[in-house]
UniProtKB/Swiss-Prot annotation:
Record bears the keyword Magnesium: yes
Listed name of the protein: Phenylalanine--tRNA ligase alpha subunit
Cofactor binding summary note: Binds 2 magnesium ions per tetramer.
Species this protein is from: Sinorhizobium medicae (strain WSM419) (Ensifer medicae)
NCBIfam families according to UniProt: pheS
Top-level class of the enzyme under EC nomenclature: ligase
Length: 360
């Protein structure tokens, strides 16, 4: 057996026996390093004749390539083995709270939290979630909801209109989530029990108004729905949402094109301090509008008002978030201020449930 064959066998055995990256690195340095065994052999080529150099040089370089490839392969094996061992050894308890590290200090926006809270409440009552497009046609946003041609909401100063299309039709950014009521009635047969959270758009901006804001509406359609049912649903919602045992509500006559009769709902509260307290006090706070679905709206949804009836309500998510959590300025919701989010935001694991507490 030649000297090179013996060296090759020795080095390959050492590579195979290397148990970690440190050991394989030691073999590499001993063979291919500046003073390694193969490097020393390459240095002897200078004293050989041209013919010897050509023959022996090719064999030494072949040995060098073989050893280099074996080292790379062994490194990959050791790396894979280390990863497999680590995966087998490590376990993650997913029930533990998120660790407090910079990457895990994010906050849930109050609007997202409010939507989850409302969904939990109405989901417990048997309601399902419905959604629709933000860009609506004039028909779904106005006509189908019994808005007459001259209604102020159709004016440019109140609604965001798109440029007319090739047919001359102007689409709008929806001014309420009510178009989803029509779309749901067209697609489903009663009984219908839905809530509709979503973004809405109107040309208004101050401390309590924003050009884009959030609403949630509810709709119940069947053969026997009545005002008493509506009152019970809204009272149960307010008790659960504001987390109080009792609420006192008053229903004031009002007007909305899509309901008849229509009401504005106030809830009794205490406004003497910086935070509004519900379930106590002698003050009143308006929180939502509601009413029995107008017969014309039922017809637009493809339902016979002589057979079906229902009730609907709507409220501003931003407004009730401000009331519940004491946020003074609506514009702060959209300013992307990390300090505000740190103060008013919610932890990722603060999942609202009726049993664990909505805002625990």
């Amino acid at each position: 057996m030649s000297e090179l064959e013996t060296l090759e066998r020795t080095l390959l055995a050492e590579i195979e026996a290397a148990a970690d990256e440190g050991a394989i690195e030691a073999v590499r340095v001993g063979a291919l390093g500046k003073k390694g065994s193969i490097s020393e052999l390459l240095k002897t080529l200078g004293s050989m004749s041209a013919e010897e150099r050509q023959t022996r040089g090719a064999r030494i370089n072949a040995l060098k390539n073989t050893v280099s490839e074996a080292i790379s392969a062994r490194k990959a094996e050791l790396k894979d083995a280390a990863i497999a061992e680590r995966l087998a050894r490590e376990t993650v308890d997913i029930s533990l709270p998120v660790r407090s590290s910079p990457a895990e200090r994010g906050r849930i926006h109050p609007i997202s939290q409010i939507v989850d809270e409302i969904t939990a409440i109405f989901g417990d009552m048997g309601f399902s979630l419905a959604e629709g497009p933000d860009i609506e046609t004039d028909y779904y946003n106005f006509t189908a909801l019994n808005f007459p041609e001259g209604h102020p909401a159709r004016e440019m100063h109140d609604t965001f209109f798109f440029a007319p299309d090739e047919k001359g039709e102007r689409k709008v950014l929806r001014t309420h989530t009510s178009p989803v009521q029509i779309r749901t009635m067209e697609a489903e047969q009663p009984p219908i029990r839905i809530i509709i959270p979503g973004k809405t758009y109107r040309q208004d901006s101050d401390a309590t108004h924003s050009p884009m804001f959030h609403q949630v509406e509810g709709l119940v359609i069947d053969r026997t729905a009545n005002v008493a049912n509506m009152r019970w649903v809204l009272e149960e919602f307010c008790k659960a949402f504001f987390e109080v045992d009792q609420v006192t509500m008053r229903f004031r006559p009002s007007f909305f094109p899509f309901t008849e009769p229509s009401f504005e709902v106030d809830i009794q509260c205490d406004r003497s301090g910086p935070i509004v307290k519900f379930g106590e006090g002698k003050d009143w706070m308006e929180i939502l509008g509601c009413g029995m679905v107008h017969p014309n709206v039922l017809r637009a949804g493809g339902l016979d008002p002589d057979e079906f009836q229902g009730f609907a309500w709507g409220m501003g998510l931003d407004r009730i978030a401000m009331l519940k959590y004491g946020m003074p300025d609506l514009r702060d919701f959209f300013n992307a201020d990390v300090r505000w989010m740190t103060h008013y935001g919610f932890r990722p694991l603060d999942m609202p449930t009726l049993f664990g507490g909505l805002s625990a």
